[in-house]
């Protein structure tokens, strides 16, 4: 019996200071995993540049269980000897000209199979380095390769083309390559919501969709295969004794395990692993959860969920400890997580040290004290369990330690009645924001407040600004006047309190005249910069084509207003509107003639739509171009008829 089995069967014993022995559970040893600098290895490519490793796995051959095979992005395969205290490189060669995404040992032998992005799988002899065979048939990159633990000649591959292929090395080669003996096409294709209009042409290969890719294949026994897809969210079990090539539509699996999460869109799986009994399936989902299914029963819902890590890619894998008590998985937050399978809600242990996403993780099948991990920081690390007496520190010096273990601190659950304070985005720098003049001093209701804006995680919250209701000033002169300390601003049209504005959502406020006549005037910051365009629009909406006198007065008042605009930074309409109001108050104290009243009334109609009284107005006929002299009496209409009769 090995030391590992003795520890598992009898438990972990620690000797106290008084000499007595105490029995501890095996989970109490998890915090002893450490990675020394001598167990950190950099993965290199063809040009001696560091490249990320994609897959790692321990050998199952007798006497070779300490051999670790690692494949990287440049197609290189490296064999490490992890049996010694300092792991060393046994062999290294370039297996493919493209990336190797997965690797699998042939059970009980010194051979392994590599699945590459060059659409082929290759069988290698590790001792001699010879290529024993090439397997062709996929139309896209191969993402996964798997053997049954008691079968040496048959293995399976899954690719991005959505096909699952079964290979047998006992079959003869054709054109120098091995061909698949069984194929499951479209294993994880999403069902189409509509019928494709284009017809399939004879002799043309089917189009390849990246969303139908097969991410993982795994044997559960010699006749059943488990697979997962990228986006369909379904784990499927296939009976290899069936002929799936006869299906004209999507093939029907023996059993299907639908996505059990709460996400609205279906997600995919990046890794699948079985315990050593073959009854519990652990699936790494891209929703940051690991679901455990009991595949020996009839239920298709998970029996446990492991959470706490992060999974944002299809390279994160998981592995089960040789005693079936713990689950280890990579994570996108640069850590390796270890859960106790019998207690999924317990906080996991974190193996910290990597600086990028941890992808593949392998637990030595014959040594509980050894874990291998691959990361996007271009390193492969061997984590060893450093058993030390109680009360003593690690035997490895801090300078030589590149990885350590801590327990993840779970966030406390919120009480049902507790609500966190609303975080507000800090106010922006006024100098960096372009100033745009509004059509009214009142804020538009569609403008978002501070609570409605997104808050970055690295910014501090600011108190919300108090919104005060605008008040009408006592004097118009006081409203447009500003002090020396006040910022430069435009004199904008004040809104009458008696009018109701309901079209604020479009950031447009209507004046009284436009509201009554049905001709809305769009007032925004852009039109304020072009007073000539604004005057032309107002003249079109208020004047008639035959009113030549009104047009001349409009041009005259507009030119005067332009001069005032350059001095007081106000619009020409503002100066004309104020002058009309002043004339109104001046003229109210003295009697007015019909002609003067008509002129003032026309000026108000032309220049101040907002100041028009809601009561009906009298319409005056426009005066003629030649003014009648006051000494000459006006002719009667009857005199014209008399002349016409005399002629």
Swiss-Prot record:
Biased composition (Basic and acidic residues): 543-558
Phenotype seen when the gene is deleted: General developmental defects, including apoptosis in the central nervous system and a dorsally curved tail, which appear by 28 hpf. Effects are due to general cell cycle defects, including defects in the G2/M checkpoint.
Molecular function terms, GO-annotated: protein-macromolecule adaptor activity
Domain of life: Eukaryota
Low complexity biased stretches: 586-600
Function: Substrate-specific adapter of a DCX (DDB1-CUL4-X-box) E3 ubiquitin-protein ligase complex required for cell cycle control, DNA damage response and translesion DNA synthesis. The DCX(DTL) complex, also named CRL4(CDT2) complex, mediates the polyubiquitination and subsequent degradation of CDT1, CDKN1A/p21(CIP1), KMT5A and SDE2. CDT1 degradation in response to DNA damage is necessary to ensure proper cell cycle regulation of DNA replication. CDKN1A/p21(CIP1) degradation during S phase or following UV irradiation is essential to control replication licensing.
Name this polypeptide is given: Denticleless protein homolog
Organism for this UniProt entry: Danio rerio
């Amino acid at each position: 019996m090995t030391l590992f089995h003795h520890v598992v069967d009898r438990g972990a014993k620690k000797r106290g200071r008084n000499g007595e022995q105490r029995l501890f559970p095996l989970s109490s040893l998890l915090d002893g995993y450490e990675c020394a600098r001598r167990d950190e290895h950099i993965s290199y490519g063809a040009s001696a540049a560091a490249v990320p490793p994609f897959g790692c796995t321990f050998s199952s051959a007798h006497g070779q269980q300490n051999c670790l095979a690692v494949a990287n992005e440049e197609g290189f395969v490296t064999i490490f000897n992890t049996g010694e205290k300092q792991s060393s490189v046994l062999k290294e060669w370039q297996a493919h000209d493209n990336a190797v995404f997965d690797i699998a040992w042939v059970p009980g032998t010194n051979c392994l199979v590599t699945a590459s992005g060059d659409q082929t799988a290759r069988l290698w002899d590790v001792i001699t380095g010879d290529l024993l065979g090439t397997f062709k048939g996929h139309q896209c990159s191969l993402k996964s390769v798997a053997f049954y633990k008691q079968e040496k000649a048959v293995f399976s591959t899954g690719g991005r083309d959505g096909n699952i292929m079964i290979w047998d090395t006992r079959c003869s080669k054709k054109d120098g390559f091995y061909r698949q003996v069984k194929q499951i096409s479209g294993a994880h294709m999403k069902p189409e919501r509509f019928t494709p209009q284009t017809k399939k042409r004879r002799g043309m290969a089917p189009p390849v969709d990246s969303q139908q890719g097969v991410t993982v294949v795994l044997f559960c026994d010699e006749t059943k295969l488990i697979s997962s897809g990228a986006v369909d969210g379904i784990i499927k079990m296939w009976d290899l004794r069936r002929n799936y090539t006869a299906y004209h539509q999507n093939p029907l699996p023996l059993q299907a395990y639908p996505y059990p999460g709460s996400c609205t869109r279906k997600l995919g799986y990046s890794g699948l692993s079985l315990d050593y009994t073959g009854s519990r399936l652990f699936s790494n989902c891209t929703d940051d959860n690991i679901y455990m299914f009991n595949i020996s029963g009839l239920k298709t819902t998970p029996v446990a969920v492991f959470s706490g890590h992060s999974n944002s890619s299809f390279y994160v894998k998981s592995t089960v400890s040789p005693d079936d008590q713990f689950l280890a998985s990579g994570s996108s937050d640069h850590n390796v997580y270890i859960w106790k399978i019998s207690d999924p809600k317990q906080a996991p242990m974190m193996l910290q040290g990597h600086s990028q996403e941890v992808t593949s993780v392998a637990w030595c099948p014959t040594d509980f004290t050894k874990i291998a991990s691959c990361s996007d920081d271009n390193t492969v690390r061997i984590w060893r369990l450093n058993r030390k007496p109680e009360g003593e520190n690690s035997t490895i010096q801090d300078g030589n330690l590149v990885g350590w273990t801590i327990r993840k601190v779970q966030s406390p659950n919120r009480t049902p009645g507790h609500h966190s304070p609303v975080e507000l985005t800090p106010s922006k720098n006024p100098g960096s924001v372009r100033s745009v003049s509004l059509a009214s001093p009142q804020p538009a209701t569609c403008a978002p407040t501070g609570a409605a804006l997104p808050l970055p995680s690295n910014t501090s919250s600011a108190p919300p600004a108090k919104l005060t209701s605008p008040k009408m000033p006592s004097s118009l002169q006081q409203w447009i006047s500003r002090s020396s300390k006040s910022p430069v601003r435009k004199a904008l049209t004040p809104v009458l309190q008696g009018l109701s504005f309901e079209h604020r959502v479009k950031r447009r406020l209507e004046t009284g005249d436009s509201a009554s006549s049905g001709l809305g005037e769009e007032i925004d910051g852009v039109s304020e910069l072009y007073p000539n365009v604004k005057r032309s629009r107002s003249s079109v909406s208020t004047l008639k084509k035959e009113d030549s006198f009104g047009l001349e007065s409009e041009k005259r008042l507009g030119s005067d207003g332009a001069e005032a605009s350059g001095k007081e930074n106000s619009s020409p309409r503002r100066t004309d509107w104020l002058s009309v109001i002043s004339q109104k108050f001046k003229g109210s104290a003295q009697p007015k003639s019909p002609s003067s009243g008509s002129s003032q009334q026309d000026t108000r109609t032309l220049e101040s739509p907002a100041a028009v009284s809601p009561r009906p107005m009298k319409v005056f006929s426009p005066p003629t171009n030649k003014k009648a002299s006051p000494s000459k009496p006006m002719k009667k209409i009857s005199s014209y008829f008399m002349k016409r009769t005399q002629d």
